[in-house]
C-alpha cells in the first residue's frame, strides 16, 4: 500500500487505516484530528468543514480535513448518528521526546451501538445486539448497553421473533457471524436500516458468561463481548454478568403493536408527547427514566411481581408527605449507572466524581425516608440500599467542590487530603507573595513607577519595562526579550523564586493528577455495588412516579381474576384523557364474561371505535406493569400477549402495502395467540376489494372464535358480519351510539350493546366538505345498493376455514342463494369504481362526471 514519495507520517496513517477500512480515521496531529484521502472528502461534505490538501504542490495532493481535538466530540456524534464508525488514533508519546515519527495507536472505535460519550446526552438506552444461529431457524440473541453495563441474552425460535426483538430494543447496530444468510443480512441492513458488523471470534469471560445459558446464547454473548473488546480496546469492569431472559416472562407485543398503541412515542410525530411514556413519566432520575421505558416495553405476566409493585404504589399513595420528601431527595441523584461506566472507561473527570459523591450523600436520606414509612412492603427495596459511606467519604474528602472537568490543570484535590500536595501549594502561595515583594522593592529602588512583574510560558516571570524607562533599568537586571515598545528583564533573585514556584507548580500538578487517578481507581472497585444501588434507586423512582400519576389522574388499583373475565367500569383512554382533560372525556365500560370471547364493533368512522380498543390495551398494559389504571373499577385476567392491527399504515420497515401488512399481522395473531391473549383488529380487510375483505374478515373471526379463543375486539365496517352473533355463541355485537335529529348526526362516543343500524359514512363525507350534489347522488346509490344487499354466509362453526367451505358455497349457489363471492348485477362494479375514486383530489366537475358514469352502470 506504500507509495514511493509518501512521508513516514503518512505511511503510518495508511498502515493504521488499513486495519479500519469501514471507519472514519481521526488521526491526532498536535491540536487537531486530521482525516485524509476519501475520509477527508466524505467528512468535509457531511460535517461541513473545509477540505484542503497535503503537499499542495505535488502532482496528486492528498485531500485533508481536520477538526480541533477539544471539540472533536460534536463531530464524532454527527458521524455516529448517521450510522458511521469512527476510529480515534491518539499520539502515544510526547512529540517533543519522540525519535522519528510520533507513535500513534487507535485507542477506541466509536460505533452507533457503543456510544458512551456524547455532546447530546440522552437518558435512553443504546443497545448493541448480537445474533447467532447454526441452522437459520433457532437464534441466540444477546444485547448490551455499553453506557450502563446492562447485558442480557435469550433464545428465539424463528427469525420473525429476532426481527421483532431488535425493533423493540431500538438497536442501531447488529453484530453477526459470517454464517448468517444473505437474505437475513439484507433484511437487517436494507429493510431495517441497521449497521451490520461482523464478528466470528468469541471472548470467553467466565466472570460475565453464565454457563447455564444455551450454546447459541453463549455464542451470541461471547461475540458481543469480543466486538466490544475490539472496538473499545480496554477492559470494562462495569459490564454486568449476562442475564438470561424469556420473551414469555413478559406481556408479548410486536414492535408494530407498541407503535400503534403509542407506548414509547407518538406514532404520528415520533415524539414523546402523547405517548404512554409521556403520561407516566414523573421520574426524577435518569436511571428511573430508563427503567420506566423498560417496564412499559415489558409488562409482567407474573401475578406475584405485579402485586409487589402494586403494594408499594399503594403505600406511596397512602403516605403523601413521606412520598413528597422522597421525591425531593431523588432530584439530587445523578445517573449512577453512566457515572460508573465512565469510571470503567477511564473517562470520569473530577466533576463526574463530584456528582457521584453528591449522589452518595443523598442515599442515606433516601433510605431513612423509606424506613420512615414503616411499611413491610418497602422492605424489599430498603434492604437493597447500600449507602457505601466509605466511598462517599473518599470522594467528598478528596475532590475539591470547585474542581473543573479537566484533570491536568490542578485545583482538583482538596487541601488537607495529601500533606505533600499541601506543601507544594504553600510554596506556590508564598512564592506569589515573594514575587509581589520583589516587584515592590525593585519599583522603589529603580524609580520606575510602572514597573511590574508578568508571566508567560516562554519567558517565565519577568520585569516589564517600557522603552521610555529603559534608562532607569538597574545594572543587576538582565534582558530576557525585546519587544517593539518594551523589554523584558530578569534578576537572579527573581529567577531563584521563579524556579521554586514553577517547580512547586509542576510537582503539584503532577501529584494532583496521580492522586486523582488513585481515587478513581478506588471508585472503580465499587462499580458492581454502584450498579446494584442504581437498580434499586431506579425501581423506587419508577414506583413513586406511577404513584404520582395515579394520584393526579384518580386511577384505581386493578384486580385480577382467573375466570378469564374483563370488567372495566367507566374506563378511559389514559393518554387521550390527559390531552383532552377529564371533564371532556367520555368514559366507556368494557365487559367480557367467561363465555364471551369476541366483541364485534360497528359504528361510523371517527366515532371512537379505535379509541375504545386502544383504551382496553392501555388498561391491560398499565395494569400488568404493576401500575394503577384509568377507570372507576377494573378486574382483568393476566394476558400473555397483545396483537393489534389498528390504523391503515403501510409497513415503513419492509415496504409492504397496507393490505399485505394487515394479512401478515393477522397471520401472527392467529398463529401465535393463545386463549390468554388479547387481539384488537380495526377494519381488517379494508385494503382489498369489498367481497375479498368481507370473506377474510368473516373467516378470521370464525377462526379466532373456534380455535384461538382469545379475547378479541373486532371493529368492522362490514355490517353484514353482525349476523355472525346468531351462529357464534361467544361473539357479541356492540356499536358506537349516535344521535340523529333533523337530518343531523352527532357521534356520542359511547359504546352500547347490539349492532349499529347505519354506517353514517356519507355523514362523515359531509363533515369532510364534499360537494352537496355529490353527497346526494351517493345517498341515492347507497339506497340502491342496500336494496340488493349481500347476504352473509355462515359456515359450520366447528371449522372456520376448511375444504368443506367450497361444498357449502356450491350448494348455496344451486339453491339460488347469493354467495359472498358472487356479485349481484353490477353492484360490485359500482363499488369498485367508487373505491377507486380519489375524492380528496376531485374537482366538482370531475365529481359530476364520475357520478354520471356510475349511473350508467346501474
Swiss-Prot record:
Domain of life (superkingdom): Bacteria
Cited SUPFAM superfamilies: DNA repair protein MutS, domain I, DNA repair protein MutS, domain II, DNA repair protein MutS, domain III, P-loop containing nucleoside triphosphate hydrolases
InterPro entries: DNA_mismatch_repair_MutS, DNA_mismatch_repair_MutS-lik_N, DNA_mismatch_repair_MutS/MSH, DNA_mismatch_repair_MutS_C, DNA_mismatch_repair_MutS_clamp, DNA_mismatch_repair_MutS_core, DNA_mismatch_repair_MutS_N, DNA_mismatch_repair_MutS_sf
Keywords (A to Z) from UniProt: ATP-binding, DNA damage, DNA repair, DNA-binding, Nucleotide-binding
Coiled coil: none
Keyword Ribosomal protein listed: no
GO molecular function: ATP binding; ATP-dependent DNA damage sensor activity; damaged DNA binding; mismatched DNA binding
A GO cellular component annotation in the UniProt record: cytosol
Binding site for ATP: 603-610
GO biological processes: mismatch repair
Family recorded in the similarity comment: Belongs to the DNA mismatch repair MutS family.
Function statement: This protein is involved in the repair of mismatches in DNA. It is possible that it carries out the mismatch recognition step. This protein has a weak ATPase activity.
Protein's name according to its UniProt entry: DNA mismatch repair protein MutS
Organism in which the protein naturally occurs: Streptococcus agalactiae serotype Ia (strain ATCC 27591 / A909 / CDC SS700)
Amino acid at each position: 500500500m506504500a507509495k514511493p514519495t509518501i512521508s513516514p507520517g503518512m505511511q503510518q496513517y495508511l498502515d493504521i487505516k488499513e486495519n479500519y477500512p469501514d471507519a472514519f480515521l481521526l488521526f491526532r496531529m498536535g491540536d487537531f484530528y486530521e482525516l485524509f484521502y476519501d475520509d477527508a472528502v466524505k467528512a468535509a461534505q457531511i460535517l461541513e468543514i473545509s477540505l484542503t490538501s497535503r503537499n499542495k504542490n505535488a502532482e496528486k495532493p492528498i485531500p485533508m480535513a481536520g477538526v480541533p481535538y477539544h471539540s472533536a466530540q460534536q463531530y464524532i456524534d454527527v458521524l455516529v448518528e448517521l450510522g458511521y464508525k469512527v476510529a480515534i488514533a491518539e499520539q502515544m508519546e510526547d512529540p517533543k521526546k519522540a525519535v522519528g515519527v510520533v507513535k500513534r495507536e487507535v485507542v477506541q472505535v466509536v460505533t452507533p451501538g457503543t456510544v458512551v460519550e456524547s455532546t447530546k446526552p440522552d437518558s435512553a438506552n443504546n443497545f448493541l445486539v448480537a445474533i447467532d444461529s447454526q441452522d437459520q431457524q433457532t437464534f441466540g440473541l444477546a444485547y448490551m448497553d455499553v453506557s450502563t453495563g446492562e447485558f442480557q441474552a435469550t433464545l428465539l425460535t424463528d427469525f420473525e421473533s429476532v426481527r421483532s426483538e431488535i425493533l423493540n430494543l431500538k438497536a442501531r447496530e447488529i453484530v453477526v457471524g459470517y454464517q448468517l444468510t444473505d437474505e437475513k443480512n439484507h433484511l437487517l441492513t436494507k429493510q431495517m436500516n441497521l449497521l451490520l458488523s461482523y464478528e466470528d471470534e468469541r471472548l470467553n469471560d467466565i466472570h460475565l458468561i453464565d454457563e447455564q445459558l444455551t450454546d447459541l446464547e453463549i455464542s451470541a454473548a461471547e461475540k458481543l463481548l469480543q466486538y466490544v473488546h475490539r472496538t473499545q480496546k480496554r477492559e470494562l469492569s462495569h459490564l454486568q454478568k449476562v442475564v438470561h431472559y424469556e420473551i414469555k416472562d413478559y406481556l408479548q407485543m410486536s414492535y408494530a403493536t407498541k407503535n400503534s398503541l403509542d407506548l414509547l412515542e407518538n406514532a404520528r410525530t415520533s415524539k414523546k408527547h402523547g405517548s404512554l411514556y409521556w403520561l407516566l413519566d414523573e421520574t426524577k432520575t435518569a436511571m428511573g427514566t430508563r427503567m420506566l421505558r423498560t417496564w412499559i416495553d415489558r409488562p409482567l405476566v407474573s401475578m406475584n411481581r405485579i402485586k409487589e409493585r402494586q403494594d408499594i404504589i399503594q403505600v406511596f399513595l397512602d403516605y403523601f408527605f413521606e412520598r413528597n420528601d422522597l421525591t425531593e431527595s431523588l432530584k439530587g441523584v445523578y445517573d449512577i449507572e453512566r457515572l460508573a461506566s465512565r469510571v470503567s472507561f477511564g473517562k470520569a473527570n473530577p466533576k463526574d466524581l463530584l456528582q457521584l459523591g453528591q449522589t452518595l450523600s443523598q442515599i442515606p436520606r433516601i433510605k431513612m425516608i423509606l424506613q420512615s414509612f414503616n411499611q413491610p412492603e418497602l422492605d424489599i427495596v430498603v434492604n437493597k440500599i447500600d449507602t457505601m459511606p466509605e466511598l462517599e467519604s473518599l470522594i467528598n474528602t478528596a475532590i475539591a467542590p470547585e474542581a473543573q472537568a479537566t484533570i491536568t490543570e490542578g485545583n482538583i484535590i482538596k487541601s488537607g487530603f495529601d500533606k505533600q500536595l499541601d506543601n507544594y501549594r504553600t510554596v506556590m502561595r508564598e512564592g506569589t507573595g515573594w514575587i509581589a515583594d520583589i516587584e515592590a522593592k525593585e519599583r522603589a529602588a529603580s524609580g520606575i513607577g510602572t514597573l511590574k512583574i508578568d508571566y508567560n510560558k516562554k519567558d517565565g516571570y519577568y520585569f516589564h519595562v517600557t522603552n521610555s524607562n529603559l534608562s532607569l533599568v538597574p545594572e543587576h537586571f538582565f534582558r530576557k526579550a525585546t519587544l517593539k515598545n518594551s523589554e523584558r528583564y530578569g534578576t537572579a533573585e527573581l529567577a531563584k523564586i521563579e524556579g521554586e514556584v514553577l517547580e512547586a507548580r509542576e510537582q503539584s500538578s503532577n501529584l494532583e493528577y496521580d492522586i486523582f487517578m488513585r481515587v478513581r481507581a478506588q471508585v472503580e472497585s465499587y462499580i458492581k455495588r454502584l450498579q446494584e444501588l442504581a437498580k434499586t434507586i431506579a425501581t423506587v423512582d419508577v414506583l413513586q412516579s406511577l404513584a404520582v400519576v395515579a394520584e393526579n389522574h384518580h386511577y384505581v388499583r386493578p384486580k385480577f381474576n382467573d375466570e378469564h373475565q374483563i370488567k372495566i367500569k367507566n374506563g378511559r383512554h389514559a393518554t387521550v384523557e390527559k390531552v383532552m382533560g377529564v371533564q371532556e372525556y367520555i368514559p366507556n365500560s368494557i365487559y367480557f364474561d367467561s363465555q364471551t370471547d369476541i366483541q364485534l364493533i360497528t359504528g361510523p368512522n371517527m366515532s371512537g371505535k379505535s379509541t375504545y380498543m386502544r383504551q382496553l390495551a392501555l388498561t391491560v398494559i398499565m395494569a400488568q406493569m404493576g401500575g394503577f389504571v384509568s377507570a372507576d373499577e377494573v378486574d382483568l385476567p393476566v394476558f400473555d400477549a397483545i396483537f393489534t392491527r389498528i390504523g391503515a399504515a403501510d409497513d415503513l420497515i419492509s415496504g409492504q402495502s397496507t393490505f399485505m401488512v394487515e394479512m401478515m399481522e393477522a397471520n401472527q395473531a392467529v398463529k401465535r395467540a393463545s386463549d390468554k391473549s388479547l387481539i384488537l383488529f380495526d377494519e381488517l380487510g379494508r385494503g382489498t376489494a369489498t367481497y375479498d375483505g368481507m370473506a377474510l374478515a368473516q373467516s378470521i373471526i370464525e377462526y379466532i372464535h373456534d380455535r384461538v379463543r382469545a379475547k378479541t375486539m373486532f371493529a368492522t365496517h362490514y355490517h353484514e358480519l353482525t349476523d355472525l352473533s346468531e351462529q357464534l355463541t361467544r361473539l357479541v355485537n356492540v356499536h358506537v351510539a349516535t344521535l340523529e335529529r333533523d337530518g343531523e348526526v352527532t357521534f356520542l362516543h359511547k359504546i352500547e350493546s347490539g349492532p349499529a343500524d347505519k354506517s353514517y359514512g356519507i355523514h362523515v363525507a359531509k363533515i369532510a366538505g364534499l360537494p352537496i350534489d355529490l353527497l346526494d347522488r351517493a345517498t341515492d346509490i347507497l339506497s340502491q345498493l342496500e336494496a340488493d344487499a349481500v347476504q352473509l354466509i355462515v359456515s359450520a362453526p366447528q371449522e372456520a376455514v376448511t375444504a368443506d367451505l367450497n361444498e357449502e358455497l356450491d350448494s348455496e349457489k344451486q339453491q339460488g342463494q347469493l354467495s359472498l363471492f358472487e356479485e349481484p348485477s353490477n353492484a360490485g362494479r359500482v363499488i369498485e369504481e367508487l373505491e377507486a375514486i380519489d375524492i380528496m383530489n376531485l374537482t366538482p366537475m370531475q365529481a359530476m362526471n364520475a357520478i354520471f358514469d356510475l349511473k350508467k352502470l346501474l
